[in-house]
UniProtKB/Swiss-Prot annotation:
Active-site residues (renumbered): 18 (proton acceptor)
One Gene Ontology biological process: L-leucine biosynthetic process
HAMAP family referenced in this protein's UniProt entry, alphabetically: HOA
Pfam families given in the database record: DmpG_comm, HMGL-like
InterPro entries according to UniProt: 2-IPM_HCS-like, 4OH_2_O-val_aldolase, Aldolase_TIM, DmpG_comm, DRE_TIM_HOA, PYR_CT
Protein name in the entry: 4-hydroxy-2-oxovalerate aldolase
Assembly and interaction partners: Interacts with MhpF.
Enzyme class, first EC level, given as a word: lyase
Gene of this entry: mhpE
Ligand binding (Mn(2+)): 15, 197, 199
Organism encoding this protein: Escherichia coli (strain SMS-3-5 / SECEC)
Length: 337
């Protein structure tokens, strides 16, 4: 690792939405965004957990609109860029333009790891707007490193200047991460950046992020207190402490991040964001982390174990966007009891 500065991308106000069913108040957003900005992170992602226009029956309704959340963050931020997430098929280019007008300057266009071809229009439009445009390959554990690299190359061709390996299921280990970054680096242009988005379901969020940086990764997603889907993301303050120990340049204030994690974020959790029986099952079965709260609801409704539902979803290789299948699986399990 040379002396390059890592790009620290906070996702507390987007992935963290999943942990509290998309119920951040505008004041929560202002407080967290200001604390992150004061700690000098590079970008702060703000949106419904499932991206622009994710507020819906399928994914869960948000306490506010994406634009209200983005405007609230943009109002208090002086240093960091406001980022947002867009999943083609949920959000449109019109939603992206509205987000840009509200203050978003970075967009991560997210697709399933084998479906990069649906991102062309959105990536091209983001570039036309002048946004920092990132390709985000979700559930990256579900395809081979070589296939992932081909998908990354497509996104690069559409205009993305950074491509992310996204461990949405928190299912990968350090070797899996290394293999994918080596495959991406072998085909992407030298100037195209790479990023890592880890989940902590196997307690490897920080270790996987470190492995990614050792393979040349430029941008690291993390969240305060790990606030995110499943067992959460790589905890930002923990990653920064580890990076500091390694002598890496990150430009952030560790103690300010520690304070924000414990004083602002942990008190908001109505269900602890941690590795436990259910979230470990997510990582072990390779299931989309944001299925957690939906599965727990279905388990309570139908008198089942959430772990049984999660394991069955893993066997059926369900992916993000198939939240409606959780109830189907629960009914199948109940009927087969």
């Amino acid at each position: 690792m040379n002396d390059k500065k890592l790009y620290i991308s906070d996702v507390t106000l987007r992935d963290g939405m999943h942990a509290i069913r998309h119920q951040y108040s505008l004041e929560n957003v202002r407080q967290v965004a200001k604390a992150l900005d004061d700690a000098r992170v590079d970008s702060i992602e703000v949106a419904h957990g499932d991206g622009l226009q994710g507020s819906s029956f399928n994914y869960g309704f948000g306490a506010h609109s994406d634009l209200e959340w983005i405007e609230a963050a943009a109002d208090v931020v002086k240093h960091a860029k406001i980022a947002t997430l867009l999943l083609p098929g949920i959000g449109t280019i019109h939603d992206l333009k509205n987000a840009w007008q509200a203050g978003a300057r970075v967009v991560r266009v997210a697709t399933h790891c084998t479906e990069a071809d649906v991102s062309a229009q959105h990536i091209q439009y983001a570039r036309e707007l002048g946004m920092d445009t990132v390709g985000f390959l979700m559930m990256s554990h579900m395809t081979t490193p070589e296939n992932l690299a081909k998908q990354a190359k497509l996104m690069e061709g559409y205009g993305a200047t950074c491509i992310y390996v996204v461990d949405s299921g928190g299912a990968m280990n350090m070797s899996d991460i290394r293999d994918r970054f080596r495959a991406l680096k072998a085909v992407l242009k030298p100037e195209t950046q790479t990023g890592i988005h880890a989940h902590h379901n196997l307690s490897l969020g920080v270790a996987n992020s470190i492995a990614a940086v050792e393979e040349g990764c430029d941008r690291i997603d993390a969240s305060l207190a790990g606030m995110g889907a499943g067992a959460g993301n790589a905890p930002l303050e923990v990653f920064i402490a580890a990076a500091d120990k390694l002598g890496w340049q990150h430009g952030t204030d560790l103690y300010a991040l520690m304070d924000a994690a414990d004083d602002l974020v942990r008190p908001l959790q109505d269900r602890p964001v941690r590795v436990d029986r259910e979230t470990l099952a997510l990582g072990y079965a390779g299931v989309y982390s944001s299925f957690l709260r939906h599965c727990e609801t279905a388990a309570a409704r139908y008198g089942l174990s959430a772990v049984d539902i999660l394991v069955e979803l893993g066997k059926r290789r369900m992916v993000g966007g198939q939240e409606d299948m959780i109830v189907d699986v629960a009914l199948d399990l109940r009927n087969n009891k």
